[in-house]
């Protein structure tokens, strides 16, 4: 593929994503041409290869389609190390060491301050955090070059610390010679106080000013601490001038941190400021699923969904709720169920009305009638398929706020067909004992009052 066409592809992509995403994932790509009818793009590593394939292959194919390609195909190829180096910006020249600066200590274990549980591999990406994740990965790929400093803010328990440690692990893996230091602002302050008291400020400064990556959590606690702000200001300058990467986290953006010196606030805004929001339902379910798999817990999808609907605040509470349900099930020797989960969480989280979605109903009906959901939504007209379809449409109308046209669209039918199905089920209730029992059982399940495996 010519570079002109490739430039058009990138132009299309750039219009449809954020600048952070573009510079993180697309700017480094290498056009390797067309092979066997597929556009082949060179990437840095297998992580980027898999991420691009999952997240952006469709966008690239749309770009090719917009340029006239009939059946566009895109593949990603990991480049050899020698070619990979061509994708990264060259290292900036190191700043001269100031006269009298103490020599850096010899390299130590560069992961000693990192939590081994927090890596990119077990960080669940969703719409609430995709930009922060992309920025963190860009920094990990090119420390000191991409965004410096990287400032991540958001409420407690949303994954800021996880991302910071993930960057540390990634850099430690790729650059074992790099010195990495993670510290909370409270610890930094306490260590400074001790250093002043014991006349060890030189050692303190050398420790934090000789690192290649400095990760500082809860930087908002610098507010009001004049001596700590003064020390951190000079630490920041020393690292920045030597092109060392700085990542900061906070519960608010720099402009909202009261009693923070203006010179620090302006420096915090030099790089990229990105936030993490509370995860939406699908991301919460994915987080629970990953946590359960990591701990080798076999728990039904519907139970995970109930927990995700019940706990909407932050990830820590979400994971805590999962462990509470697991403990409740184990201690009471009862299998996992929606009812068990509701009871386990009832004394901790305020009960919330569970919002039932159309797919929830379809899934339950499919399970009850032992039939794939796609078959129920399909065009089959035999009684074995029609009855479950009518029951699903009846329950969706009964348990959700969706209109007849919306239900019809979900099933690929018009609203009059749905109206007929609902009337048919309504007419048979009380007459057909088998149908009545099925509807009542499914209704109780959807309200979380009964589970197909057990009852609490």
Curated annotation (Swiss-Prot):
Gene Ontology MF term list: ATP binding; ATP hydrolysis activity; DNA replication origin binding; lipid binding
Pro residues bias spans: 90-108
GO CC terms, sorted: cytoplasm; plasma membrane
Example GO biological process: DNA replication initiation
Xref: PANTHER family: CHROMOSOMAL REPLICATION INITIATOR PROTEIN DNAA
Domains as described in the record: Domain I is involved in oligomerization and binding regulators, domain II is flexibile and of varying length in different bacteria, domain III forms the AAA+ region, while domain IV binds dsDNA.
Protein name: Chromosomal replication initiator protein DnaA
Organism: Deinococcus deserti (strain DSM 17065 / CIP 109153 / LMG 22923 / VCD115)
Gene designation: dnaA
């Amino acid at each position: 593929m010519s570079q002109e066409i490739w430039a058009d592809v990138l132009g299309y992509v750039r219009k449809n994503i954020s600048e952070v995403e573009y510079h993180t994932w697309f700017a480094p790509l290498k056009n390797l041409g067309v092979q066997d009818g597929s556009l082949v793009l060179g990437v840095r590593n297998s992580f980027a290869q898999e991420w691009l394939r999952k997240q952006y292959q469709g966008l690239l194919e749309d770009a090719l389609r917009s340029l006239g390609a009939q059946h566009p195909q895109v593949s990603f190829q990991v480049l050899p190390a020698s070619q990979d180096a061509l994708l990264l910006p060259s290292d900036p020249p190191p700043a001269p060491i100031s006269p009298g600066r103490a020599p850096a200590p010899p390299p130590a274990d560069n992961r000693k301050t990192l939590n081994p549980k927090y890596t990119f591999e077990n960080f669940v990406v969703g719409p609430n955090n995709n930009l922060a994740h992309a920025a963190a990965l860009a920094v990990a790929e090119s420390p000191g070059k991409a965004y410096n400093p990287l400032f991540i803010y958001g409420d407690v328990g949303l994954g800021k610390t996880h991302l910071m440690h993930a960057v540390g692990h990634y850099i430690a893996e790729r650059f074992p010679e790099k010195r990495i230091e993670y510290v909370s602002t409270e610890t930094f302050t306490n260590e400074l106080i001790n250093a002043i008291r014991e006349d060890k400020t030189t050692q303190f400064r050398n420790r934090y000013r000789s690192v290649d990556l400095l990760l500082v959590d809860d930087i908002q606690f610098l507010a009001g601490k004049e001596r700590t702000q003064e020390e951190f200001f000079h630490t920041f300058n020393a690292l920045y001038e030597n092109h060392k990467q700085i990542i900061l986290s906070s519960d608010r953006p720099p402009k909202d941190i009261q009693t923070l010196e203006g010179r620090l606030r302006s420096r915090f805004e030099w790089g990229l400021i990105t936030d993490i929001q509370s995860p939406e339902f699908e991301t919460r379910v994915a987080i629970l699923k990953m946590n359960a798999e990591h701990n080798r817990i076999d728990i039904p999808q519907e139970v995970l969904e109930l927990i995700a609907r019940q706990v909407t605040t932050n990830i820590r509470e979400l994971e805590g709720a999962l462990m509470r349900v697991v403990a409740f099930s184990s201690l009471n020797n009862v299998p996992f169920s929606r009812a068990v989960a509701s009871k386990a969480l009832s004394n901790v989280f305020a009960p919330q009305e569970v919002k039932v979605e159309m797919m929830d109903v379809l899934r339950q009906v499919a399970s009850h009638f032992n039939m794939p959901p796609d078959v129920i939504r399909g065009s089959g007209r035999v009684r074995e398929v029609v009855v479950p379809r009518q029951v699903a449409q009846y329950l969706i109308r009964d348990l959700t706020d969706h209109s007849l046209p919306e239900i019809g669209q979900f099933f690929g039918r018009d609203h009059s067909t749905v109206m007929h199905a609902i009337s048919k089920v309504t007419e048979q209730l009380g007459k057909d004992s088998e149908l009545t029992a099925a509807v009542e059982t499914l209704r109780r399940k959807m309200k979380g009052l009964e589970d197909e495996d057990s009852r609490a």
